């Protein structure tokens, strides 16, 4: 059942906005209402609302004390952010409007401000985002309750009567456009008609209510739902408002938003169920696409090419950080969008790998590793790195097909066609096209280039593993190294090859445990933490400033990382560097 009882969590927002705007003739709409009803949040932080009126006039009359505020004049969007120290709330008002002429598949050519809420509904993307909320203090009839309403009964009454009053939740739902035209003329509640709706005794009461017991004062929660979004929330269907082709051709970003909504909402529902620790055999109903909506998404997939890349990036980032990336990639593939967004990944399909390492093609291995990674790591950049960590194998394996000798293979693996390097190059190309920042791309590339490093550490004997891990920690920091170890675990789990015993991850888990111990006992030890500085080395060895000083500090650091407590002493460092310089001098003489 939907969480109608949680609607009261929206009352403080309604009260706050009433004070700021100076009137209560507005409606919360969109994600805040959807998430409250689904139970995926009790405290939404992004509150979208709408009302009738000219945006400039509304903006002028807002009480701006204690809030940051700005208006986007072209589309009339007004943003209000409370200035409280720990505030994360944002309110965004877009006045009721109608739109025409979406010639660029994104922005309307003309906007008409309106006082018709039913007209505003028609410009919304999906039915589950077109549920409007308001509230009203009034006296309502109280009936003796016979039984609790269930989902089947709720939908039956709504479909027949067009409205229902849920006494337990003090919630009134109205879907009938005929009733709504009388309830909200000019986008303002007609309280007389509201009383009329509550006072009559339709099937909405007869099914589960007995005799009338009088009236009581309540804070009535009102849901205005002409697009029948309640039905789709109950049945977990993503459906466009009106004709799907029209909706997607008006605004092509809706194609990707639709995939993201289904993906992220399902992840939230699964997470909520796990937190409740209910019976693991209980089934959770998850969102799927209404057939015509999905058919339209697939047939209009090429419209994705018309969308501004920064908007695509925003949708992908939300899905990869909040949702199920593995599932999203599957949807993108089925909707023929994968090759548009991630071309290097699409090319890995049907490229077989050496059976002794991988029983699957490159693509299958990659998405399996992504599946395992998302269970242990939520960092969206790490997840994107996992998505591209092996895409360079396409070029590497193409060279293998030329019957190279062992020496030629050795040279290939030492060069740019080694998939650790070529994958990073391909990631840079594809993520730059998606408008990822230079910093984000560098981070993704770093994980790709280093994704074999944990394997290499495990090849060392146990005595040297701690030193190698300290070196990696010194260079990259705890969070990056921990992420690399997660990538390593997921990479191994994605092999599914009994010959490699990939299910035994005890050594990789040992590295994670060792990393935590080093971090807690020693922290990230870097050259600046050495007992000697560059100037000490210059003075001790009578050297001038130059490249050699940095090299000697690196030599010292490499030595000290073997046992920080014992070796980070000036006399030991100088003795080690003296031997190093002596060896250098000998090599130079041999070169002469």
Describe these PLM feature segments.
Residues 1-592:
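Catalytic cores of the polymerase beta-like nucleotidyltransferase superfamily
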């Amino acid at each position: 059942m939907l969480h109608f009882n949680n609607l009261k969590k929206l009352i403080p927002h309604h009260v706050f906005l009433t004070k700021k705007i100076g009137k209560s003739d507005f409606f919360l709409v969109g994600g805040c209402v959807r998430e409250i009803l689904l139970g995926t949040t009790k405290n939404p932080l992004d509150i979208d609302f709408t009302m009738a009126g000219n945006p400039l006039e509304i903006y002028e009359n807002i009480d701006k004390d204690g809030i940051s505020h700005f208006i986007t004049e072209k589309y009339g969007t007004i943003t209000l952010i409370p200035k409280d120290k720990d505030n994360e709330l944002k309110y965004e008002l877009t006045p009721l409007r109608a739109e025409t002429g979406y010639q660029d598949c994104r922005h309307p050519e003309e906007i008409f401000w309106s006082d018709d809420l039913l007209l505003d509904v028609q410009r919304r993307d999906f039915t589950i985002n077109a549920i409007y909320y308001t509230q009203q203090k009034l006296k309502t009839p109280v009936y003796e309750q016979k039984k609790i309403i269930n989902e089947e009964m709720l939908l039956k009454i709504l479909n027949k009567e067009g409205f229902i009053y849920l006494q337990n939740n003090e919630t009134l739902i109205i879907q009938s456009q005929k009733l709504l035209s009388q309830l909200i003329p000019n986008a303002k509640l007609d309280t007389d008609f509201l009383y009329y709706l509550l006072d009559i005794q339709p099937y909405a009461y007869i099914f589960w209510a007995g005799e009338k017991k009088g009236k009581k004062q309540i804070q009535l929660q009102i849901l205005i739902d002409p697009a029948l979004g309640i039905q789709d929330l109950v049945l977990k269907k993503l459906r466009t408002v009106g004709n799907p082709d029209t909706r997607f051709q008006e605004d092509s970003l809706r194609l990707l938003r639709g995939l993201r909504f289904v993906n992220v909402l399902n992840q939230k529902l699964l997470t909520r169920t796990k937190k409740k620790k209910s019976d693991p055999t209980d089934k959770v109903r998850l969102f799927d696409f209404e057939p015509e909506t999905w058919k339209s998404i697939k047939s209009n997939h090429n419209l994705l090419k018309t969308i501004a890349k920064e908007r695509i990036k925003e949708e992908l980032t939300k899905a990869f950080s909040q949702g199920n990336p593995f599932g999203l990639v599957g949807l993108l593939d089925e909707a023929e969008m994968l090759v548009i967004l991630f071309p290097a990944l699409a090319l890995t399909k049907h490229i077989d790998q050496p059976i002794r390492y991988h029983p699957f093609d490159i693509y299958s291995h990659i998405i399996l590793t992504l599946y395992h990674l998302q269970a242990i790591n939520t960092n969206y950049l790490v997840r994107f790195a996992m998505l591209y960590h092996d895409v360079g194998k396409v070029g590497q394996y193409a060279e293998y097909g030329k019957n190279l000798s062992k020496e030629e293979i050795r040279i290939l693996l030492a060069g740019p066609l080694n998939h650790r390097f070529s994958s990073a190059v391909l990631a840079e190309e594809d993520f730059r096209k998606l408008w990822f920042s230079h910093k984000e791309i560098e981070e993704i590339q770093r994980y790709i280039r280093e994704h074999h490093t944990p394997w290499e550490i495990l090849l060392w004997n146990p005595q040297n593993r701690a030193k190698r891990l300290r070196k990696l920690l010194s260079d990259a920091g705890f969070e990056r190294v921990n992420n690399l170890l997660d990538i390593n675990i997921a990479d191994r789990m994605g092999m599914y090859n009994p010959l490699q015993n990939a299910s035994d991850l005890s050594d990789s888990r040992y590295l994670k445990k060792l990393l935590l111990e080093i971090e807690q006992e020693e922290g990230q030890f870097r050259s600046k933490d050495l007992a000697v500085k560059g100037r000490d080395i210059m003075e001790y060895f009578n050297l001038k400033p130059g490249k050699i000083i940095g090299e000697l500090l690196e030599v010292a650091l490499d030595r000290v990382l073997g046992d920080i407590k014992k070796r980070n002493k000036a006399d030991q460092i100088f003795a080690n560097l003296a031997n190093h310089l002596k060896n250098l001098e000998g090599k130079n003489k041999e070169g002469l």
